[in-house]
Every structure is written in C-alpha cells, then in structure tokens.
C-alpha cells in the first residue's frame, strides 16, 4: 500500500508537469505578420510629443487596420524609455510577427510635421500617408475618437516634465485596459474608471486627458484579439520588474497597475487556495477532499515551475491554463467559495453559475465558518505562545464581534447566494437577525398553510396584509421570551425587514400582470 501511494504521488507530479524542451531543438515558427513601429529618431521632446499626438489620433481612427494599430500601440507603450528601439528589440521574441522599426524626425515640408528618417531619400509623402486620418476619396477629415475634452486641439509640448505627465496619463489608461481585456471585456468599464479615479487622486495622471469611450473600446478590443500585443505588454512588465534600483515614474506606475493584471483569469485557483486551504478548517480532513487536495498540490508545483510568466498564463493564452480551472477540483472549489462568502463581503458578487458547482459543499464551507467563529487554532496559538486564558479571552471577544456583524448584515454576500441557504424546519426556533430565517419566514410562517407559490412569488390564498400580523405576533412572542438586549435589537430589525418584505409583496400583488419573480436582493442590497 505504501508503494501504491508513492506511485500515486509520482504520477500526479508527472501528470501536471510543465513540458520541457527536447527533440531536435528547432523552434516552430508561424507565418509572420510584418508590423511597422515608428520610433523617435532623435532625443527632442518636440519630436516625441508630436509623434505621441499622431499615434493617439491613429489609434482613434475607426478605419485603421489591426496590424497598423498594433504597431501604433507598441510605439506608444515604449515612448517613456530613452531608447525605444533598443527596448523593443530586446524584449520582442514573437513567432507570429516581424517588427520593422522606422525612425521618425521632424519635417517642415510634410503635412504631419514628421517624416521617416532616411539617407538622402524623400519620404515625406510616405510619412503623410502613414499618419493620415483623412478619408481615402473625399479628403475630408473623419471624426476620430479623441479625448473626452474636445477642446484639446493637440498634445504637442516642449517641456520634458509636461510630456512625462501627458504620456503617463495616456499610458495609464492603456495599461488599465489589459487587466480585463481578456477575462471580462464587456464589464470592464466600471473597474477601469475606478482605477483611473485612483491615479487622478494620487496626482499620477491629469484628469482632463481622459480618453473617450470609443478610443478605449477600440484599444481594448485590439488587446483582446491580438496575442502579439499582449506578449509585448507582458514582456515589458517583466523587463521593468527585473530592472534594479530606482525606476522611472511611469515604470513604477506600470508596476502598480500590474497588481490588477497579475493572475487575471486564475481567480478560481487562487481563491481556492486562499479560502479552502489557508484557512485550515477541519473540513479539509474529509475523504472527499483527498484527491482534490493532491490535485491542488500538483498544480501549485506546476505554477512554480512556470516561473515568472505563470501569473500571466491566461493573458498569454498558454494552453496549460485549463489545468487550473475549477473543474479539476469542483468539490474543494465549492467549499472554498462557501468559506469566502462568509469571510469577505467582496465575494458576494462572484459568479457561481458553473455546471460543476456543488451547493452541498458550498453550505459546508458556510457552516464551518459560522460554527468555528471565535475558536482559536491550537497550532497557531502554540506557535505564537498564546496561553489558554488568552485564547479564551480571544474567543469571547470574537464571538461578540461575530454577533454584531450578523446583526449589521452589511454587504451583498447573502443576497447573492440566498438560493443556496437551508430552510428552517417547522419546529425550529428562528433567529430573527439572520437573513436565512428572514427569507424562510414567509413560506413557513404557520402550519397547514398552502405554501405553493404562484408565478409572482406569493403564497396562494394569502395576501401580504394577512401574512404580516402572524409574523409580527410570532416576533412579539420571541421578543417577550428573550431578556437579552441584543436579542431585542435583532428582533426589532427583523420586524422592520419583514414589514419591508410585506410592502414588496403588496406592490407585486397590485401589478398582477407583471411576471417578475420576488427577489430578496431588492430588500437586502
């Protein structure tokens, strides 16, 4: 049997092992797409600011093709370094694209004010064609996506400090797009705006240089569909992290935004470790979790083998990302989600709609948190040198804090997962302050009642006005039997919630033609 267990552990390690280079050693190269990337040909701030102005206009052109937009974004992302050309050549190793660097200098003869540097050849017309945003036939200027403040005519500056602040304001918005461009592009606008407000308050960016929605949507879509652009952005992040000593201000800002980008798409794996394993609840000893705990251990080893690119595996479309899906450990994931929604209010908005989601293990996680509230881990207590008296004091304080937290009932966590809660039995004494019993009070208010619900969510044969007095009477009896002031406060709050519930049911009864289903999120949000 011991040999079998050793073989099983070895099998799991080899199964989830990262592939190693072997064979002939030749790299597989695809058909490369040529991308032109304009870079400044001198160190003049005027040249850089003028190039940035043209690049922002090109990115806002609704008719720009994908390859050209990728080159524009690569050029824009590398403008903050002293030698953009060297940076691009050093970090670019993409089997799908071939980057052609073109130096750009000032010109008084071209319409764009820029031209391609060359030895004797006149490339003003080529530069005007590249930077042009005019229509191909009429010659009239199209409406391009620009800044929200349309009073901004151009962004050409001559001072280095002004240019750095202007460039930081634009690059911050581009880097913020990467955080959810792959995982949740349709719902990314709200979180992107919150992060923009954060950097505006920190004076890292200038608020009036907020790009309009069309510009941001176009760039976000390009980041989502172009793997080569994402590879460049991840390589740039890793190169900045490896840089020793003090970094440029824009580089530090990129590292700060990276905290939102890192581990994108790996929430199931990371949260399972955080809430399922690190909490160290005794439920981990269940036989049902034995196999999945072994799987998690193998995945953690694989994560470490991938090295510095592991947190970006989803952004880089690494095929190994499927191994980290919650479908590989559904019971442990369901249990961890139950623990999470009880410990953190922010977990209430997480989407649990998965085919492998198990409500029983979700409730197991919830109950472990509730029944373990106020208990002190003996292992951690021994490690920290906590005495038995101190542990008892901590348990008492934690229990009181947990009761107050239940009374407050803040946050959307229970409202989001109310369909998973146990319903109280007929003979059980309800606890008025908890949301589960408040929800269960309406269908289980009296015995012998026809609890079959109509389409609108109301009990048949009963109106909210008839139902509320019975619930109020039960609540009065519960209040009279309790001498604890905290219990009295709970009962008062429960009564208020039940009255609000009755009001909602009355509104639904008035609009009988409306087929909306009663949802307790309207009350508890």
Curated annotation (Swiss-Prot):
Region ranges (Homomultimerization): 1-36, 373-391
Record GO cellular component, one term: host cell cytoplasm
InterPro entries hit by this protein: Paramyx_ncap
Chain spans, region Interaction with the phosphoprotein: 477-505
Ranges where the record places region Disordered: 418-492, 506-525
Region (Ntail): 404-525
Superkingdom, natural source: Viruses
Localization annotation: Virion; Host cytoplasm
Binding site residues for RNA: 180, 195, 202, 260, 351
GO molecular function terms listed in the Swiss-Prot or TrEMBL record: RNA binding; structural molecule activity
GO biological process, one term: symbiont-mediated suppression of host JAK-STAT cascade
Keywords linked to the UniProt accession: Capsid protein, Helical capsid protein, Host cytoplasm, Host-virus interaction, Ribonucleoprotein, RNA-binding, Viral nucleoprotein, Virion
Complex formation: Homomultimer; forms the nucleocapsid. Binds to viral genomic RNA. N0 interacts with the phosphoprotein (via N-terminus); this interaction allows P to chaperon N0 to avoid N polymerization before encapsidation. Interacts as N-RNA template with the phosphoprotein (via C-terminus); this interaction positions the polymerase on the template. Interacts with the phosphoprotein; this interaction leads to the formation of membraneless organelles that function as viral replication factories. Interacts with host ISG15; this interaction disrupts the activity of the N0-P complex.
Domain notes: Ncore is globular and carries regions required for N self-assembly and RNA-binding. Ntail is an intrinsically disordered monomeric domain in the C-terminus.
Annotated protein name in UniProt: Nucleoprotein
